[in-house]
Amino acid sequence: HCFGVVLATMNCLTHGCTEVMVERFNPLVVLASIHKERCTALYGVPTMFIAELNHPMFDMFDMSSLRTGIMAGSLCPVELMKQVEEKMYMKVTSVYGLTEAAPGMTATRIDDPFDVRCNTVGHDFEHTEVKVIDPETGEECPVGVQGEMCNRGYNTMKGYYKKPEATAEVIDENGFLHSGDLGVKDEDGNYRITGRIKDMIIRGGENIYPREIEEFLYQLEGVKDVQVAGIPSKKYGEAVGAFIILHEGVDMHESDVRDFCIGKISRYKIPKYIFFIKEFPMTGSGKIQKFKLKDLGLQLCKEQGIEIV
C-alpha cells in the first residue's frame, strides 16, 4: 500500500490538497464521491477502474471535474486506459515500482503522449538511477533488450529490518536494488515492463507468493504434491491457479479444495483455477518448470471449457 500512502496521502499533504477517502473500496461510493466533491484526480489499481467503469449506475455521475490520476499496482491494459480517458475525462499516468523502491522507480507524465502513457511506465525519477541488466551476467542491456529492472537512489530501501542476508540478495555491492521484474528501455528513455523473474502472482494489485499457498495446500489430506502459478485474468491481470497431484486412489473435487481454504487463508489467495494433473513439467534434472504451468493452465481451461475471466 506504499503507492497510495506516498503518492496520494503524502502528496496531498505536501501540496495542500484535499483528499477524499473512502472506508474501503466500493465503486459506487467512489463515483458518488467524485460527483459530490468535484475531485480532480483519481488513483487506483486497474481492477478498481474496471469496477467503476462497469458499474450499472456509472452514467448517473458527473466525472467532468477529473483532470488526471494514476493507475498502478498491476499491469495496466491499454484498452482500459483508453476507456478511462474517454469516459472519465482524465489523463491517466502510471507508476512502476515496489515497496523496496518507494514510491516507485519510473513514472509517466501528464504531458506525455497518449501512446507513452498507455504503453510504457515512463522515465526514472530525478536524482535516481534505473538500469536494465542481464540477470545472468549483470551487464547492462542495450536499448530494446529485455532484462531485469534495477534501481539506485534516495527511493531505494536501506534493507529489510534485521535481515542482512535477505537484503544482500536484492541489493548488490553497488547499491542497486534488483526488482526481479523484466523490462525494456526504448530509445526515448521510457521503460516497459514485460514480465517477472520471480514467481510472484499479482492479482488486482495484491502480491501473492505461490509458496505460501503451496505449503498450505500440502496440509489437505490426499494431496501428494502441489504447485501454484499465475493464470492470465481479464479482470485481475492474474488469477491464482493450483496444480495438484493426488495420492493414488484419492478422489477430490475443486469444491473440496476451496472449502479447505475458506476461513484459513485470505480470500484473494484462494485458487480461482484448480487442476488435478498426473505430473508437472520437469527438466531433465528433475526440477519443476514452473514457467510452463501458465501455458498448461490455459491449455487445460480450453480443453475443459473453462472461461478465462
What kind of feature is each model-predicted range?
Residues 34, 42-45, 153, 158-159, ...:
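AMP-binding/adenylate-forming catalytic core of the ANL superfamily
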Residues 93-100, 121-124, 229-232, 275:
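Beta-strand->loop->alpha-helix junctions that form or flank phosphate-binding loops
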Residues 22, 28-31, 50, 58-60, ...:
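Short hydrophobic/charged patches on amphipathic alpha-helices used for structural packing
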Residues 1-22, 44:
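Conserved AMP-binding loop of ANL adenylate-forming enzymes
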Residues 295-309:
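Acidic/polar alpha-helix N-cap and adjacent early helical turns
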Residues 75, 115-162, 170:
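Adenylate-forming AMP-binding core of the ANL superfamily, especially NRPS adenylation
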Residues 73, 97, 122, 153, ...:
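Active-site glycine-centered loops adjacent to acidic/histidine catalytic or metal-binding residues
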